[in-house]
Structure formats: C-alpha cells, structure tokens
C-alpha cells in the first residue's frame, strides 16, 4: 500500500517534515573554500550558447575579479530535480495538463544517475514521491495528484486556507536539498500567489541559494498578478519564470527548462575573501562576447565559523 506523507507547514522544522530515504543521493564532503557557480548563456534571440570555454568567462565576487580554478560544461553530470506542484483549488482546470507534461519531462530529462522527487502544496506540503531515479514511480505519483477542493468561506474568526508558496520552497530546500550534492533544480508549477506563508520571500531565496539550487517557475495565472511572486523567487537563483498560456504550453516550457539544465556551465573559484563569516557575497559573471546574456544566481552565503 502506498504511503503518502502529508504535513502542515506551520511550526515544523525541516528535520521534522522530511526524513532521509535509502534512495536519496548520498551526501559528500566538499571543500568549502571552493565556490561552484552554475550559469547558462543565451544570445539576443534567446538561443542557448554551448560552445564557450574558460577564457570566455569572467567572474567577480563583491566586485573583485576571481581566478577561475575549475570549468566544465554540465551536460551529463548528475542532476537532482525537486518538482513542486500547486494543488490548491484554483488549479483544478489545468492539473491534467500538468500531469501529462510533467510525466514527459521526467521521461526525457532523467538519466540513470539523476534523481527527482515530487511534492504538492497548498496549505500543506505533501511528499508524493521521494528521491528516485525511476520516471515510472514519478509518473505514478503524478497520476495520484489531485486538487484540494474549495470548501467555502471560513467561519467568522477563522482564517482562509492559504497557498504557502514560500514555505513550500523554504522547507524543500532545507529539508530535502540541503544534503544533496551536485546540480540541483527546483521546478514550481503554480498560479504564483502566496497566501499565508510564515517564511518571507527573502527567507525562501536565502534557503534556496544556500543549497546552490536553481528555481524555475511555471506560472499559469489567469486572473491575478501572482506570476511576479514566482519571478521574484526564481531570478535571484539564476532561474527564470515562464508564463503558460496562449504563447507557450506547459509542455513547451518544460522542454525549454530541460534544454537549459543540459546546457549549463560550471565555474569554480577559491574566493579571495576567505573569511568564514556567514555573510552574503554578490556574484557577477560576464562573457567577453558582446550580445550574450548570462543567467546566474546573484550570490551565495559564506560558510560560518
């Protein structure tokens, strides 16, 4: 019998919500004095540029140029994907399309060394499938995803059930991705509205950045202005927000995300500022070829003493 873990986000630590499973990618020890930065490069038409070398890049931390120690193109190295799907009542009409597109995404993007997990969120965070390399398990879990029905307005003195977008991103980063090595991406499929999260936007961004995870938002907002919530969460991590609708279907967006994940550059450097002070360090990556755009996280937090 399939067991589904459903937990309330409010008042629970990540260690309470999530337990490590045997299928989870094993943690590894890393040299904390080497900072690894993932980025993608696009031309003025949005086409991905995949033929650049180490000497084409320049990286700065807090304005100071850093010496690039390691450089690779991350086409085949292991990837971990956390997919978070909004299952609040407002998504009922698009949930079937989401299931099909996400299933094809897992079929296409996952390779034997990759892992993914699936979570649903509304006023609670539900772990539908923990870390697995099996797209079949993920598709089976997708088939069980269902929207939480709207049960009417709350009684006087009670609060309206919320869509805890920021809490979901925060808890997933802290509870599932923090101990996972290598490349990581968080895909959030939602109408983008956050209503009732305990964590603020800055808290969610900090948690995600601390795990070196890129966030991609897929927004299907039809009536509200919720897409800006996803955009504000994704861009500081080096990711993007896509609007699903007449111009692009959810499946087309997943295809773009897949291409970006397989077209990343990895740049490693030893910071000139070696202080373990826990402070935020701003990052800037440039390429020497005019007209190219680099997508990269805006910074990272130095280790603490």
Where do the PLM segments sit?
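Scaffold/interface architecture of coatomer-like assemblies
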Residues: 18-305
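Bacterial N-terminal signal peptides
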Residues: 2-16
């Amino acid at each position: 019998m399939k067991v589904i873990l459903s937990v309330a986000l409010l008042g629970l630590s990540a260690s309470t919500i999530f337990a490590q499973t045997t299928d989870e990618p094993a943690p590894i020890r890393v040299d904390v004095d080497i900072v690894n930065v993932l980025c993608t490069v696009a031309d003025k038409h949005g086409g991905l540029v995949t033929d650049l070398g180490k000497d084409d890049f320049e990286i700065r931390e807090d304005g100071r140029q850093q010496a690039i120690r390691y450089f690779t193109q991350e086409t085949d190295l292991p990837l971990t994907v956390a997919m978070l799907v909004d299952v609040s009542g407002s998504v009922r009409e698009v949930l079937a399309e989401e299931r099909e597109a996400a299933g094809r995404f897992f079929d296409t993007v996952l390779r034997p060394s990759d892992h993914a997990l699936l979570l649903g969120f509304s006023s609670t965070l539900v772990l539908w499938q923990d870390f697995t390399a099996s797209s079949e398990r993920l598709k089976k879990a997708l088939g069980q995803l269902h929207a939480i029905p709207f049960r009417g307005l709350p009684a006087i003195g009670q609060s309206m059930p919320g869509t805890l977008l920021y809490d979901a991103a925060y808890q997933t980063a802290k509870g599932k991705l923090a101990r996972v090595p290598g490349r990581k991406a968080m895909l959030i499929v939602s109408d983008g509205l956050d209503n009732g999260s305990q964590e603020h936007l800055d808290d969610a961004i900090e948690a995600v950045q601390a795990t070196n995870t890129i966030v991609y938002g897929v927004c299907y907002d039809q009536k509200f202005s919720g897409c800006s919530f996803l955009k504000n969460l994704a861009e500081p991590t080096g990711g993007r927000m896509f609007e699903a609708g007449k111009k692009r279907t959810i499946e087309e967006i997943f295809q773009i995300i897949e291409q970006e994940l397989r077209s990343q550059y990895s740049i490693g450097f030893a910071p000139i500022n070696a202080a373990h002070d826990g402070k935020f360090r701003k990052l800037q990556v440039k390429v020497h070829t005019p007209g190219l755009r680099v997508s990269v996280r805006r910074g990272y937090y130095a280790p603490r003493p």
